[in-house]
Amino acid sequence: MTTSAEKRVPVRVGVLLINLGTPNAPEPGSVRLYLKEFLSDPRVVEIPQLVWQPILRSIILTTRPRRSAEAYRQIWTEEGSPLAVLTARQARALAGAFGPAVIVDHAMRYGQPAIAERIDALAAAGCERILIAPLYPQYCAATTATATDEAFAHLRRMRAQPAVRTLPPYHDDPAYISALARSVGEALAELKFQPQTILASFHGMPERTRQLGDPYYDQCRETARRLGDALGREVRLAFQSRFGRAEWLRPYTDASLRALPGEGVTKIAVIAPGFAADCLETLEELAIRGRAAFLESGGSDFAYLPCLNDSAVCIEMLRTLIGRELEGWLAPE
């Protein structure tokens, strides 16, 4: 069925899906380059660079790449990094979804393909308007804002700028909650055990970001609450991937997985609704290390349920969210 957005978009419109990024290979050298770019972003590490850079270069980048490379090797596929593969598939699945006038591409905030490179490619293809679409349901300065920062920084260098719009966060959007509920419901139906608890694990952030006014924590809570309502059962909240010595958002996922068996919860399903596609944090940190921690602590059954990835429900959701934003861009009479 032809949508009104398809009928009315201008000659060329670009849609740029953006996710976090990944090393090019599961090797220490590649991981080091990736971590250097990622951890040098002041949106990610909010410490004065004069203080932070010596720590990053002399300690973190000399020790962490080897450990991280081993973790990446455990989840790497023949096609490459799961995050890179799945994000590319999402873009391909949306090709043609809004008519031939709309070009859908993808980029990574860190690593390749770079945001600047893909904006240039869309402009070269004749796109007069570009929708920047960070694939982060919950807004956070360290994810959503830095993606748009990078896009706008490149726009500042362009002589002929396209018109630009950004996809807003969609943590409570009915299309997103419905997609999550359908995906989780279908995955639960395939399990050979009945989980006593569903644990929704979101990427952690320093507690300080919440105190400074970042809405991320509240949006994660709202997503978990709405998903629980849609499923008709409680969804517990936790935060993973903490880094450094500072206090991060609680409860911590790893601590929760170790504590739950002692509370009588021995059968669990873990989901990661803040991630648009499976990646190191879900496939290694949750599905491998999280499983081991839960079972070693007395749990009997553990299931990690996949992210939305490039599933039919995900593509339907993205069509709804993106199509809504394209509605405002009318073709010249």
Feature map (PLM): residue ranges:
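Active-site-proximal alpha-helix that buttresses catalytic centers in soluble enzyme cores
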Residues: T2-E333
